[in-house]
């Protein structure tokens, strides 16, 4: 069910099959086999094999990384690395010679560095770097980091395994497989990526918390850890497993050198400055270049000497260290191995993906010595071999006079593995048993670049006198950390204790261990290196006591490398899933914002259309009203004119009657008066007629004007009412529009919050899923580790059990011979008595041997019980750490969800608070428009009253002609 949910989270509804993209620095149309010739295999990385290739035209060498890529998505995982390599042209950064994608395989051609990686050189020489060598490496790394950080690139996986060497004594910073290329200078990252031992504290915190991202200052911390690694072969806390080392980095103080007195004050101060847990106060690479530790570096001679020594001709021979008097052991003569020249470039040449290479390792493990029948117990367990010894140098003539040039004794910092002890002058140190203290053991670790002779003499005397104590098994590391651990979020190195060595006896009262004589089972490997530095031929001879533990150490490193590859694959898949999920979330947000914008635009468009329709309807209605008004005025004017014409005709008839009456009155007068009276009366009638006619026409004109004004006023009132009605409807529409937009905004806020909340849940679901997968892989690796420990213990116990009868027979013969000799010397008693005494002694020996066998059986049972308890404790501790991490992730998810809800509620409250003034401003604007409309209507009415010649006057409709006037 969880896996189905996980697939659902990563599935996009709009995903289609991706088309092939064209990348600037990747060629798709060319078969790399036509350009490059494979001349050898360098190794097998986590994602593909690495070959040594030669350009067919120029003859240039390259390291070719060939990766199977089945899809465009997988190809995109490596594009960042290719782009970074292609854009970084710097003398201390490895160069990209080409990239090809052909026939489902990605070929990345990288500059070939013959010197190999620094960690491989340290393994080859069995010592760390000297301070002058560290200074040069540090200086060149800082210059490379300054260049990278200036291009907004974070390396994120700095360590000795990713620092390659050239024959000229320069470094090449490599492995950009987990690097980040930012778009902005101040951009930060929150990916939990890199190798645990070199991780900065702020990067460690990103495993479960993404709230504290990191920037390029994380590389400065990794640089400081890398310098400690170069000084001590191993990084700090290498004895811890990755789960615990992450907690150690996050909670403990910054690491320091194990033996500060062996190093200069400038080096210690540089480490203190670089290893600042606060990234804000941690200096940049450019600032560190001004530090006295590196500012005085002017030459790379120290690195040229280092590369020459690592690539020197090596003569190896094995000297048998067993007792010559061992009757049951065959004497093996020391046989010199064939001369060979080591090519350290064939080891860890390419640090891409940080998986160091297996097939051409610069450190060829010597053949393990077979377990021999010894008198003092079985062979040593893994991790308890002997340390190399140093011998004086052979100096060849190298000056102009042909005289021998005195060369000082080269000091070594050998690797300490368990109970290996550093000695000098090719002498084996463990002559007699003794107790070794943890402090003494730590003092002999490979952290001292220049051990003095007095310390060696003191150690030799302690071994001889049996006063040196061994560490307890629970505190002893099983094997060296694999320096080729690669770029993974976790590592397979462990800190769980090993069982007791078979070459050590247990003091059950004190609980201490004592070394038994292991010379019967160990051999001495002597190496002689010859190389030339500045015309001086130097010969260095080193000796190291070896045993079968060497092979077991190699097996342990190989198994750890396999485990780290598994974790690296998990991390790569996790990064791909995170990228897909982030892309999905970005697409969802983008689609949601587009949909929001479309919805808002659609809503605005709807209301805009409604407003437009309303305004158009209003305009049409007003135009129709005006047309109706004009028609009405014409009809009303026509009707009134007709009525006035009829009235005027009647008025004329009345005037005619009045004229007749005047005539009738005149005719009634005497004849002599008629003419004069008629003339007078007719003049009076004519004047009266004119006056009445003028008054009548004026009255008609006034009535017409009043009628027209009344009609115009009615029309204006109707239009004003219609305008008010339309404005009201328009404002209601605006209110509805704003209310719909506000409701949509609130809905969008809610929807966006729900989407972001779901995306956050998906993000944490993916984190939990990946964390559980990682935990499952860690438990699987822990189970395999525990099973290996149990199997090794069983094999060791079987060897002890098989060896004990031989030892008892040898001891029995010796004791019997000594007893018989003592009886013969004493000469007491008869032959029968001597036979009886011998018989009794034989019976006592049988009882003693039986008791030894029972004691051994009990010891084995106790060892197995302790081992099972230790394995169970290991699993419990791992489970507890994993549970704490899961609980922390769930707790952080709860806090993030709570903070997200609180932020949403706050945003919603702020939005609602801002909504009130928006509503108020809208109402004020609408009221202002109403007032402006009323003011406009009022001003129009006043102008009508003040302007009698207004177009709306009656004269507009009825111009009077001369006929009308007549």
From Swiss-Prot:
Catalytic activity: L-seryl-[protein] + ATP = O-phospho-L-seryl-[protein] + ADP + H(+); L-threonyl-[protein] + ATP = O-phospho-L-threonyl-[protein] + ADP + H(+)
Activity regulation comment: Inhibited by the pyrrole-indolinone inhibitor SU11274 (K00593): intercalates between the ATP-binding Lys-65 and alpha-C glutamate (Glu-81), resulting in a partial disordering of the lysine side chain. Also specifically inhibited by erlotinib. Slightly inhibited by gefitinib.
Top-rank lineage group of the source organism: Eukaryota
Coiled coil: 571-945
Modification sites for Phosphoserine: 13, 20, 191, 437, 449, 453, 483, 512, 547
Membrane topology field: Peripheral membrane protein
Compositionally biased residues, Basic and acidic residues: 833-863
Residues of the active site: 157 (proton acceptor)
Gene Ontology molecular functions: ATP binding; protein homodimerization activity; protein serine kinase activity; protein serine/threonine kinase activity
Residues binding ATP, per UniProt: 42-50, 65
Residue numbers carrying Phosphothreonine: 185
Chief site of localization: membrane
UniProt subcellular location: Cell membrane
EC assignment: 2.7.11.1
Bias (Low complexity) ranges: 437-451
Domain Protein kinase: 36-294
Region (Activation segment): 175-224
GO CC list: plasma membrane
PTM comment text: Autophosphorylates following homodimerization, leading to activation of the protein.
Comp. bias regions, Polar residues: 452-467, 486-512
Region span, Disordered: 318-411, 424-512, 666-688, 825-863, 941-966
Gene3D superfamilies: Phosphorylase Kinase, domain 1, Transferase(Phosphotransferase) domain 1
Assembly notes: Homodimer; homodimerization is required for activation segment autophosphorylation.
Family affiliation: Belongs to the protein kinase superfamily. STE Ser/Thr protein kinase family. STE20 subfamily.
Protein name: Serine/threonine-protein kinase 10
Gene for this chain: STK10
């Amino acid at each position: 069910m969880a896996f189905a949910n996980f697939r659902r989270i990563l599935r996009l509804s709009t995903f289609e099959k991706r088309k092939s993209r064209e990348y600037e620095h990747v060629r798709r149309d060319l078969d790399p086999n036509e350009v490059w010739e494979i001349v050898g295999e360098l190794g097998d990385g986590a994602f593909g094999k690495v070959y040594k290739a030669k350009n067919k035209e120029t003859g240039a060498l390259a390291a070719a990384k060939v990766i199977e890529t089945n899809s465009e998505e997988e190809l995109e995982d490596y594009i960042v690395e290719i782009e970074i390599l292609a854009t970084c042209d710097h003398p201390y950064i490895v160069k990209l010679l080409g990239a090809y994608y052909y026939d489902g395989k990605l070929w990345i051609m990288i500059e070939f560095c013959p010197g190999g990686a620094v960690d491989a050189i340290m393994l080859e020489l069995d010592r760390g770097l000297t301070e002058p060598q560290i200074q040069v490496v540090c200086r060149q790394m800082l210059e490379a980091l300054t260049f990278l950080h200036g291009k907004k690139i974070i390396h994120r996986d700095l360590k000795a395994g990713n620092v390659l060497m050239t024959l000229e004594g320069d470094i090449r910073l490599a492995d950009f497989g987990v690097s980040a290329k930012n778009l902005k200078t101040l951009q930060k990252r929150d990916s939990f990526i890199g190798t645990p031992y070199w991780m900065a504290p702020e990067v460690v915190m990103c495993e479960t918390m993404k709230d504290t991202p990191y920037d390029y200052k994380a590389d400065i911390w990794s640089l400081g850890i890398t310098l400690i690694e170069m000084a001590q072969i191993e990084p700090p806390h290498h004895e811890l497993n990755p789960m615990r080392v992450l907690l150690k980095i996050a909670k403990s103080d910054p690491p320091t050198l194990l033996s500060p007195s062996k190093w200069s004050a400038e080096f210690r101060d540089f480490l203190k400055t670089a290893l600042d847990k606060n990234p804000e106060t941690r200096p940049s690479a450019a600032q560190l270049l001004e530090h006295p530790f590196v500012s005085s570096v002017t030459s790379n001679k120290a690195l040229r000497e280092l590369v020459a020594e690592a690539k020197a001709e090596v003569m190896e021979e094995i000297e048998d260290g067993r007792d010559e008097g061992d009757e049951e052991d065959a004497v093996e003569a020391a046989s010199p191995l064939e001369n060979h020249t080591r090519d350290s470039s064939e080891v860890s040449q390419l640090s891409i993906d940080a998986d160091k290479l297996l097939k051409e390792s610069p450190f060829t493990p010597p053949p393990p010595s077979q377990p021999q029948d010894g008198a003092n117990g079985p062979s040593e367990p893994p991790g308890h071999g002997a340390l190399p010894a140093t011998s004086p140098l052979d100096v060849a003539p190298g000056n102009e006079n042909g005289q021998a040039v005195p060369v000082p004794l080269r000091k070594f910092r050998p690797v300490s593995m368990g109970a290996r002890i550093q000695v000098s002058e090719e002498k084996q140190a463990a002559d007699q048993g003794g107790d070794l203290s943890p402090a003494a053991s730590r003092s002999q670790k490979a952290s001292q670049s220049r051990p003095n002779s007095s310390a060696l003499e003191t150690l030799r005397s302690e071994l001889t006198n049996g006063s040196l104590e061994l560490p307890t098994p629970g505190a002893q590391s099983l094997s060296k950390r694999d320096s080729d651990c690669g770029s993974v979020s976790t590592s397979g190195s462990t800190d769980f204790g090993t069982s007791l060595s078979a070459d050590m006896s247990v003091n059950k009262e004190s609980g201490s261990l004592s070394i038994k004589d292991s010379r019967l089972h160990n051999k001495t490997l002597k190496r002689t290196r010859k190389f030339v530095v500045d015309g001086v031929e130097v010969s260095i001879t080193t000796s190291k006591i070896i045993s079968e533990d060497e092979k077991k150490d190699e097996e342990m490193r190989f198994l750890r490398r396999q485990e780290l590859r598994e974790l690296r694959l998990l991390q790569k898949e996790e990064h791909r899933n995170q990228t897909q999920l982030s892309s999905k979330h970005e697409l969802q947000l983008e689609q949601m914002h587009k949909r929001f914008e479309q919805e808002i635009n659609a809503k605005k468009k709807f209301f805009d259309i409604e407003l437009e329709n309303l305004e158009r309807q209003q305009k049409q209605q007003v135009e129709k009203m005006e047309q109706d008004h004009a028609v009405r005025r014409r009809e009303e004017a026509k009707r009134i004119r007709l009525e006035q014409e009829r009235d005027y005709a009647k008025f004329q008839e009345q005037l005619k009657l009045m004229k007749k009456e005047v005539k009738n009155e005149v005719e009634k007068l005497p004849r002599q008066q008629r003419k004069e009276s008629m003339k007078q009366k007719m003049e009076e009638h004519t004047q009266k007629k004119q006056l009445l006619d003028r008054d009548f026409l004026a009255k008609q004109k006034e009535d017409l004007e009043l009628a027209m004004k009344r009609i115009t006023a009615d029309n204006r009132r109707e239009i004003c009412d219609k305008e008010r009605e339309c404005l009201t409807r328009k404002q209601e529409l605006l209110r509805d529009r704003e209310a719909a937009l506000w409701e949509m905004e609130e809905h969008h806020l809610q929807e966006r919050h729900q989407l972001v909340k779901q995306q956050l849940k998906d993000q944490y679901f993916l984190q939990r899923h990946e964390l559980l997968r990682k935990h499952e892989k860690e438990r699987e690796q822990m189970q395999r580790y525990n099973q290996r420990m149990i199997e090794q213990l069983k094999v060791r116990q079987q060897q002890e059990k098989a060896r004990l009868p031989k030892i008892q027979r040898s001891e029995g013969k010796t004791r019997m011979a000594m007893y018989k000799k003592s009886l013969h010397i004493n000469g007491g008693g008869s032959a029968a008595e001597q036979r009886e005494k011998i018989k009794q002694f034989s019976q006592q020996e049988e009882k003693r041997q039986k008791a030894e066998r029972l004691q051994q059986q009990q010891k084995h049972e106790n060892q197995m019980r302790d081992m099972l308890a230790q394995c169970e404790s290991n699993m419990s501790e791992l489970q507890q750490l994993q549970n704490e991490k899961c609980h922390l992730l769930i707790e952080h998810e709860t806090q993030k969800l709570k903070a997200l809800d609180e932020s949403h509620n706050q945003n919603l409250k702020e939005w609602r608070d801002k909504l009130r003034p928006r509503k108020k401003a809208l109402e004020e604007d609408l009221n202002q428009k109403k007032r402006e409309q009323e003011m406009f209507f009022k001003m129009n009415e006043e102008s009508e009253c003040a302007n009698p010649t207004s177009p709306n006057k009656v004269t507009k409709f009825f111009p009077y002609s001369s006929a009308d006037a007549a």
